[in-house]
Amino acid sequence: RDLRMSRGLGDVYKRQGYEYVFEMDADFSHNPQDLPRLYRACSEEGADVAIGSRYVSGVNVVNWPMGRVLMSYFASKYVRFITGLPIHDTTAGFVCYRRRVLETINLDGIRFKGYAFQIEMKFTAYKCGFKVKEVPVIFINRELGTSKMNSSIFGEAVFGVIRLKWNSWFHKYPTVDKEMK
């Protein structure tokens, strides 16, 4: 993910005035029929961030090689352990954000570029006091194209998560206005 593109998209999302912003893979690994469930988690169940989770109720991944499943699953366990983030699928890219989450988070301050971008967004939302909820989904591997996973993305996630936690001890996160909730 190009950092400039991510920042630019954040600005576009905020300017459009939508109350809810969805992020999903365009290759249909994320089922569009699950969008209403993520929406309801935010609009009716009080979540500020709803995550389409592959791991909240077991492992729900179809057609991934076993090595990829294990790497993804244990990466999320690692992130939970290091950060204390109460999320089972920390790298999920199927997410519904309330507008106020994107308005509160300093999107220019998001540093991760690869899959770790997902971790940093969720961690920052959590540290700001937003309610994060996981919604079980089934993730189906793409039929066309290839993964962007490489050693630099992997290294960013492994070492970046430690740096993210370390920096959180010294960083003052904006807090959610209780009246907004």
Where do the protein language model's features map onto the residues?
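The conserved acidic donor/metal-binding loop of glycosyltransferases
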Residues: 25-29
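Terminal low-complexity segments of carbohydrate-biosynthetic enzymes
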Residues: 33, 44, 100-101, 129, ...
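Catalytic donor-sugar/metal-binding loop of nucleotide-sugar-dependent glycosyltransferases
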Residues: 86, 109-113, 122-139
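DNA-recognition element of transcription regulators
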Residues: 119
